[in-house]
Curated annotation (Swiss-Prot):
Assembly and oligomerization: Homodimer.
UniProt xrefs under PROSITE patterns: GCKR, SIS
EC top class named in words: lyase
Function field: Specifically catalyzes the cleavage of the D-lactyl ether substituent of MurNAc 6-phosphate, producing GlcNAc 6-phosphate and D-lactate. Together with AnmK, is also required for the utilization of anhydro-N-acetylmuramic acid (anhMurNAc) either imported from the medium or derived from its own cell wall murein, and thus plays a role in cell wall recycling.
Single GO MF annotation: carbon-oxygen lyase activity
Record-level GO BP terms: 1,6-anhydro-N-acetyl-beta-muramic acid catabolic process; amino sugar catabolic process; N-acetylmuramic acid catabolic process; peptidoglycan turnover
Name recorded for this polypeptide: N-acetylmuramic acid 6-phosphate etherase
The protein's Enzyme Commission number: 4.2.1.126
Swiss-Prot/TrEMBL keywords: Carbohydrate metabolism, Lyase
Pfam families listed in its UniProt record: GKRP-like_C (PF20741), GKRP_SIS_N (PF22645)
Additional comment: A lyase-type mechanism (elimination/hydration) is suggested for the cleavage of the lactyl ether bond of MurNAc 6-phosphate, with the formation of an alpha,beta-unsaturated aldehyde intermediate with (E)-stereochemistry, followed by the syn addition of water to give product.
Listed InterPro entries: Etherase_MurQ (IPR005488), Glucokinase_regulatory_CS (IPR005486), MURQ/GCKR (IPR040190), SIS_dom (IPR001347), SIS_dom_sf (IPR046348)
Origin species: Escherichia coli O7:K1 (strain IAI39 / ExPEC)
């Protein structure tokens, strides 16, 4: 796909005079364009849902969720991956973010890294990619060689693959088994795909990881019941989670949390079923960690 023909490289008429307007009008123009992004994502919700189901199936079978991108796209994948362990209590290696150019590229531009097909393949080899894993290639343009080569390699291994881009019919979309293509249109600053395209990618990644965690029993109601209390704020959040899930008071919630080494799920089952920590944990284990199943089936 030629660069000048890509939607993400087009000229936006709404911002054609943005360098001549007041600061407030500048902000309004950007904000008006940003409002279109959730609508673009809404149009691809069936594609996102299909990807979530595949990701969940693979992760349930022992696989991992691997994000692969360059520049802003790579950083967004790393951001999403890094938030999963503290929010949902999963092991750090379950959701992995890879960026062209390696760790240095998280904060710095690495010239030519996104053009390296070998880099995409080698980064996946270095983490021991297997057929159980799901690789999600992220590229606003849909033409990034690092991502395309990584997706091709993943498919050769038998991995399920997802391609996220903002240009229809892109190489990333056609290479991946599942394509998620929110069309956000031309950027306020021509070609600056860190803006609307980046926002769309972030919204999609939010759904992929959150959907995976909900389907994995990491959410009860709308509560993050596997949150790890790594600071004072999260200690308080744990107490509030147990309170909200059970209707108990703060003292009862804290007592239950202390008894089960601050595991929210166990504390919730303890309170709701009037069990000690060991029995509550046993019942959760019997039902794969799903609070809802413990409550509904016993």
């Amino acid at each position: 796909m030629q660069l000048e023909k890509m939607i993400t490289e087009g000229s936006n008429a709404a911002s054609a005079e943005i360098d001549r307007v007041s600061t407030l009008e500048m902000c309004r123009i950007i904000n008006d364009e940003d409002k279109t992004v959730p609508l673009a994502v809404e149009r691809v919700l069936p594609d996102i849902a299909a990807a979530i189901d595949v990701i969940h199936a693979q992760v349930s079978g022992g696989g991992r969720l691997i994000y692969l991108g360059a520049g802003t796209s790579g950083r967004l994948g790393i951001l999403d991956a890094s938030e999963c362990p503290p929010t949902y209590g999963v092991k750090p290696g379950l959701v992995v973010g890879l960026i062209a150019g390696g760790e240095y590229a998280i904060q710095h531009a690495v010239e030519g890294a996104e053009d390296s097909r070998e880099g995409g393949v080698n980064d996946l080899k270095n983490i021991g990619l297997t057929a159980q894993d799901v690789v999600v290639g992220i590229a606003a343009s849909g033409r990034t060689p690092y991502v395309i080569a990584g997706l091709e390699y993943a498919r050769q291994l038998g991995c399920r693959t997802v391609g996220i881009s903002c240009n229809p019919g892109s190489a990333v979309s056609t290479t991946a088994e599942f394509a998620i293509t929110p069309i956000v249109g031309a950027e306020v600053v021509t070609g600056s795909s860190r803006m609307k395209a980046g926002t769309a990618q972030k919204l999609v990644l939010n759904m992929l990881s959150t959907g995976l965690m909900i389907k994995s029993g990491k959410v009860f109601g709308n509560l993050m019941v596997d949150v790890v209390a790594t600071n004072e704020k999260l200690h308080v959040r744990q107490v509030n989670i147990v309170k909200n899930a059970t209707g108990c008071n703060a003292e009862q919630a804290e007592t239950a949390l202390i008894a089960c080494e601050r595991n929210c799920k166990t504390a919730i089952v303890m309170v709701l079923k009037n069990l000690d920590a060991a029995e509550a944990k046993k019942r959760l284990d019997q039902h794969g960690g799903f609070i809802r199943q413990v409550l509904d089936k016993e």
